[in-house]
Each structure stands twice: as structure tokens, then as C-alpha cells.
Amino acid sequence: MSHSENKTLFLGVLAGAAGLSLTLLLLKRNRPRYLLGFSEIWSSAKETSAVQDNQGAVLILQGRQLQMLDKLGSLLKSVEELKEEVKFLKDTLPKLEEQIRDELRGKNDARKISPQHKGIKRKKSETTKGAVEYPSSEEAESEGGYITAHTDTELESDEERGLKHLNAENAKVTEEKAELLSVLYQADTGHCGSEPDKQDTFRMMLDNKEKYGNKVEFLWRLARAYGDMFDMTSDVEEKKNYAANGKSIAGKAIQLEDCSAESHRWFAIMCGYLSEYESVQDKIKNGYLFKEHLDKAIELDPKDPLQYYLLGRWCYAVSQLSWIERKVAAALFGNPPTATIQEALQNFLKVEEMHPGYSKYNYVFLAKCYKDLGQKSVALKYCDEASAMTAANKEDKDAQKEMDTLMVSLKQ
């Protein structure tokens, strides 16, 4: 049975009951008159009969009076039957109402809300309880399933409140992540830009250091920005400060996440920068740190040509260590670092294989390796390759200077 059919049946029953009640009330009010008229007629008939008896005549009732008596008798019988029907309806209506509610309640099982709502009384229905004797079908539905506009809009379960809180937290996290990504994007763009761009990026990174100082992605980029500042300045003290601060920042990133190849890479680079301005002892110590963290970076990210270029630089530098530097290394660390020109060359060639024309400096060191190996013609070839590349930044300009000096020695 559909909801509309239930509603129509219930309203029809109520209308019928109201009509029957009204008929009964009218009958009760008019019954004395009918009974009184019947008594008077019967009394009159008895008197007439008595007179006729006294006179010795047969009592003949008027045809109209007899017809009225017959109708009144039928009416009284109908009233008695109607009383029985009304009594039956009074007994049946509560059961029918309950049956309809049960059907509606069963129909709305799927829409019932959390158990908390079952114990909550509908305040709005209480305020109007005395005004309406029977609830409407809509009220019956809301009372049966405790689903009303009031509960839908004003009452929440723990799950709903928890979901709203979670959504708010997710929105906050998403917003913070978007801000961080914007900062990282600016850092990457500035690193690839001009010197003024790199300076602006460095200041921007310092401004966000307190906010994102616990984010590995931010920290290794900040260390990289210190490296850019190291390259751009010519003041020795500034270079040392930039390198020292960059090393400290990269070290913090490694502490937070040891599996970040970029953090290990920039820690190694800062160690290499510092070794240019330190004593022999500290230079060798930073050399060991350089190799340790560079190997870790290559292990974590073996497809980055920069790391093989740096490894080639380390191998070349170790191959050029003086006798006294080797002795100091042996005294301090037991086994001094060892590397050959051939190992350096293999790393530079790997860079060229992975990324042809990677950098002007990579061509310069290829030329140096072949020169040291006695292959001057091949060395000159790579010098020509380096000359064909434009000097896009300070590093390229420094590479050009070294290449010019190298070409002079090769042509002697």
C-alpha cells in the first residue's frame, strides 16, 4: 500500500466516523420528541379504543397514524443498529490508526537516524498537542520514524559532527599544502633564473624559514639557495658563512628524513664548498663527508647526472692530492681517500651519456682528464665543445676562464 493510499484511507475513516458521530448526536437530541409523540398517539388510541369499547364499537386507527407508528418503529430499530456500528468503529479506530502508523514506520526504516535521536522529544509537536486531536499523516510519519524538519536541520549525530570536523581539518591541511607548494615552486623557478632572481628567492626562503623549517622539501631548497649565494659572492667570509649555513640546513633536513637524495646531495656540496677555505685537516674531513653523502644520494637517486658530475669532481680532486695531504689523511683517518684520473673520467663520461651538453664545466673536466692521460687531441675536442656553449651564469664564466687556460697549455 503506498503512502498516498494510506493517507486517503485514514482521512476517509476519520470523515466517516465524524459523520456517524454527528448523526448519533442528532438522534439523541430528537429521540425524546419521537418517543413523546409516539406515547401521545398511543394514549390517544387507547382513549379512542376505550370510548369505542364503552360505546361497543371496534377501535379503528387512522391509516396515517398507523403508517407513522410503523416508520417510527423502523427508525428506532435503525438507531439501535447504528449504536452498535458506532461502538464497533470506536473500538476499531485506535487499532486502525496504530496499524497505519506501523506501516508508515516500517516504510521509513531506511530513513531512521542515529539512536541518539530516538530519545529526543519533538518540542514543536508538544506545543500543538492540545490544539489537534488527531495528527496528520505527515506528523504520523515524523513521530513514527522521529524524522522531522527540526531533527534534519538542527540535530546532528556524533558521526556527522566528526565528519564536519574532519572536512574542516582536511581543508586546512590542503590550504597549508598549497601554500607550501607555491613557495617550493618559487624556489625552483628562482634557482633557474638570473642572479637577481636567485637573490629574491633566497630572501623569500629566509622569510618562510620559521613557518616551514620542519619541512624537508623546504630545507634542502634553502640549502640550495645558500649554495646560489655562495656562487654569486666574491667575498671570502661571505662564502664561508653561506657554505657553513647551507651545510647546517642540509644536515637538519637529513635528520628529519634520511632518505632524501636532495638533502644528502646538498650537504655534500656544502662540504665541498667549505673545503676550499679550511685547513688541510678540515679539508680532508669534509672530503670524507662529501663522499659519504654523495654515495648515499646516488643510491637514493641513481638517475641524476649532477651527482655523477660531483663524484667525478671528487675523484679528480683526490687524484690531485699532494704527498703531504695524503700523509695527513692517513694520520687522521687511517686510510686516506683514493681515486684515479680514470675513475674521474668515467663519471664525467657518464654525465655526458645521461645528458649530452650537460654543462660547460663537465666539458672542461673531460678535457682535463684526457690531457692528464696524454690524449691532447681528445682534450682539445672537448675544449671546442665547451667554447660552443654560451656562458649563462657565473659558473659558466668561471668554466670559460679555466678552459682558456687549459687550451693554452694544450697548444704548447
Curated annotation (Swiss-Prot):
The keyword Nuclease does not apply. It comes from Xenopus tropicalis (Western clawed frog). This is Regulator of microtubule dynamics protein 2. GO terms for cellular component: membrane. It is a single-pass membrane protein. Belongs to the RMDN family. Residues 106-159 are annotated as: Disordered. The chain crosses the membrane at residues 9-27. Residues 157-184 form a coiled coil. Its main location: membrane. It is found in: Membrane. Keywords: Coiled coil, Membrane, Transmembrane, Transmembrane helix. Residues 114-124 have a biased composition (Basic residues).
